[in-house]
Amino acid sequence: MAHSKEVPSFRWTQSLRRGLSQFTQTVKSDVLKDAKLIADSIDFNQVAQVQRALRKTKRGEEDLNKLRDLNKEVDRLMSMRSVQRNTVFKAGDLGRVERMELASGLGNLKTKFRRAETGSQGVYMGNLSQSQLAKRSEILRTLGFQQQGTGGNGVVRVWDVKDPSKLNNQFGSVPALTIACMTVQGGETMNSVIQALTSLGLLYTVKYPNLSDLDRLTQEHDCLQIVTKDESSINISGYNFSLSAAVKAGASILDDGNMLETIRVTPDNFSSLIKSTIQVKRREGMFIDEKPGNRNPYENLLYKLCLSGDGWPYIGSRSQIIGRSWDNTSIDLTRKPVAGPRQPEKNGQNLRLANLTEIQEAVIREAVGKLDPTNTLWLDIEGPATDPVEMALFQPAGSKYIHCFRKPHDEKGFKNGSRHSHGILMKDIEDAMPGVLSYVIGLLPPDMVVTTQGSDDIRKLFDLHGRRDLKLVDVRLTSEQARQFDQQVWEKFGHLCKHHNGVVVSKKKRDKDAPFKLASSEPHCALLDCIMFQSVLDGKLYEEELTPLLPPSLLFLPKAAYAL
């Protein structure tokens, strides 16, 4: 369906920022680390050659090869990149209506892109090569026919290549690359570039910066003179100094602001991201316009989110991804036949990952089904809510528990947490089965009450999984109270968890007058912490033998066997 009404573009952007704020983060240090590495390592003679090629009105195979080779080198240098991860949303990942909306949206995006790429305003393309199409246009102009589908400046830049699919994902700006190029090619210090782009980013929090704004800011920040005043167009590369590239870079280095540019898609949050996006879309009446032209904020977000299920949709390197959004994210609208009564779907259930088979999902469903929603259920995690590495659910009545692990995305943050809190080593959880933690959260009974010691992280974890229905009771023990049974619990139940093998060092500095005490202490294990908290409430050590509800074979990927 075509929509002719005007899009309130910036209002939509602000609404999406608010609605997806829980998925945004501060990424300035990561962007600058990549920018410095690119500035120090890349051959800027190659950059200049690519920029020259992209200024040509007709570009061929050699030009594309130069662009792809340079993009590959940039991708190799960057830590912030999107990787190839195809996703199929099925029943349980999203509600049926949400899946239908997503399928329709991706279909409309595909139509919009195809029309833009083929110049479809009633012009039959036929099975012609780019060079033949260009020749045909030249003949039509000679005969006095008006060229259809050209831009306002009459310039049509043409890629004459044998395989057009090689053009996919080779364009679009990357803030780290923009900052590096502005610094080196502009002969500036990186600090002055950062200050200038930060000003643009701050302006972007209240309006779309335009060329008049750029002129005014250039008076204060001389380095912005490098930003081109040409109108943006499709298929411009990250090596162009466009205003939109500068604004995106500025947005990425703001310390806060809930900027969409700082969203990261992971296998654990993908379905929650899509749910939240659809909620904002419905509330604001957003739509996809199939007519060729610039993408509106909703179209832009949906396309970027669905390009890869793992990476940085706006600001990461994505040149090594194959395919488009509608190729890499697909929707299964069928209903699977089930034997016996079907469990009601949980609105908050997260994305089913390819690593979990139907049998594994059935085992997890059975395990969660054994938890009694009418009795106390403790839940604790290790690691931040946005990147947890361990989760435990412990039900004292019945002596049952679910205990699982997850490989982190943020290795630096993980090492810091290991040193000062949980003592988990990467080698001990790198084979953790992906998807178990999120699947368990998605299966918890609706409106269940969960008991915690400190609820902020748990609330955020549930919100990220779309489980706002779950209720939390925070017992609010002091640090001393919570660790009262520390040694006794580790002695009795330490055999239940063998994944806390690092040395934990206290962050607190010792008072110079205090007696000497070893800085190391017992690590925090999510399962054993739950037992400690229950012991504190009981006023004595919990003594019952515990039963795991998940088999060990489900928690970790099988080790490869080597024959000698």
Swiss-Prot record:
This is Nucleoprotein. Its EC number is 3.1.13.-. The N-terminal region is important for the cap-binding activity while the C-terminal region contains the 3'-5' exoribonuclease activity. A CCHE zinc binding site is present in the C-terminal region and may thus contribute to the substrate binding and/or the specificity of the exonuclease activity. InterPro entries: Nucleocapsid_arenaviridae, Nucleocapsid_C_arenaviridae, Nucleocapsid_C_sf, Nucleocapsid_N_arenaviridae, RNaseH-like_sf. Transmembrane segments: none annotated. It comes from the Viruses. The keyword Ribonucleoprotein applies. Belongs to the arenaviridae nucleocapsid protein family. Encapsidates the genome, protecting it from nucleases. The encapsidated genomic RNA is termed the nucleocapsid (NC). Serves as template for viral transcription and replication. The increased presence of protein N in host cell does not seem to trigger the switch from transcription to replication as observed in other negative strain RNA viruses. It is found in: Virion; Host cytoplasm. The lineage of its organism: Viruses, Riboviria, Orthornavirae, Negarnaviricota, Polyploviricotina. GO terms for biological process: negative stranded viral RNA replication; RNA-templated viral transcription; symbiont-mediated suppression of host cytoplasmic pattern recognition receptor signaling pathway via inhibition of IKBKE activity. The keyword Lipid metabolism does not apply. It comes from Junin mammarenavirus (JUNV). Keywords: Capsid protein, Helical capsid protein, Host cytoplasm, Host-virus interaction, Hydrolase, Inhibition of host IKBKE by virus, Inhibition of host innate immune response by virus, Inhibition of host RLR pathway by virus, Interferon antiviral system evasion, Manganese, Metal-binding, Ribonucleoprotein, RNA-binding, Viral immunoevasion, Viral nucleoprotein, Virion, Zinc. GO terms for molecular function: hydrolase activity; metal ion binding; RNA binding. Residues 54-236 are annotated as: Binding site for the cap structure m7GTP. GO terms for cellular component: helical viral capsid; host cell cytoplasm; ribonucleoprotein complex; viral nucleocapsid.
